């Protein structure tokens, strides 16, 4: 995380409920580092799609609309000027591609979920694939172009996705094409 805090403005946006986030934060940032995050958003700042996950039918799909971040929908929690962040300089990282259904395609990456213990998993390490990818992101002015040219993790959900017929219903529900 130090690598990220040194190079980026970092926020945490979880689809978990607010009262469950503190334990996750301690694991991710280390004890006492919450203040280094520009914002911490929970399920309340997500959009409830009204649909459920294909893999876990009891789990609702919550969407993370980057427009809410860029437009400062929740201004009290965002310490920057309106318009300072946009599609060109924002990257959403989430293990669930469906959270980004309403965002521009190349505005997010979706690493595989971490499965412990796996001593051969170096994805998050100092020489890992994510670190290398983020080093590239830190050097560019146009994040979506970099994401498009340097695919990493799971593919985004687009019309070529095998489950598109299901996810298309969510997209249309919110008036996107």
PLM-predicted stretches and their roles:
Residues 1-27, 43:
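Substrate-recognition element of Asp-dependent hydrolases with the DxDx(T/V) motif
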Residues 22-177:
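C-terminal cap/substrate-recognition subdomain and adjoining C-terminal extension
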């Amino acid at each position: 995380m130090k690598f990220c805090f040194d190079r980026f403005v970092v926020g945490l946006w979880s689809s978990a409920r607010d009262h469950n986030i503190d334990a996750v934060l301690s694991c991710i940032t280390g004890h006492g580092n919450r203040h280094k995050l520009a914002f911490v958003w929970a399920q309340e700042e997500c959009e409830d799609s009204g649909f459920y996950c294909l893999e876990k039918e009891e789990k609702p799909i919550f969407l993370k609309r980057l427009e809410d971040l860029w437009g400062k929908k929740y201004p009290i929690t965002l310490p920057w000027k309106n318009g300072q962040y946009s599609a060109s300089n924002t990257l959403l990282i989430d293990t669930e591609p469906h959270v980004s259904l309403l965002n521009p395609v190349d505005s997010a990456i979706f690493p595989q979920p971490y499965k412990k213990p796996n001593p051969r998993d170096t994805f998050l390490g100092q020489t890992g694939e994510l670190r290398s990818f983020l080093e590239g992101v830190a050097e560019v002015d146009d994040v979506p172009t970099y994401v498009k040219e340097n695919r990493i993790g799971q593919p985004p959900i687009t019309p070529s996705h095998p489950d598109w017929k299901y996810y298309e219903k969510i997209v249309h529900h919110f008036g996107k094409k």
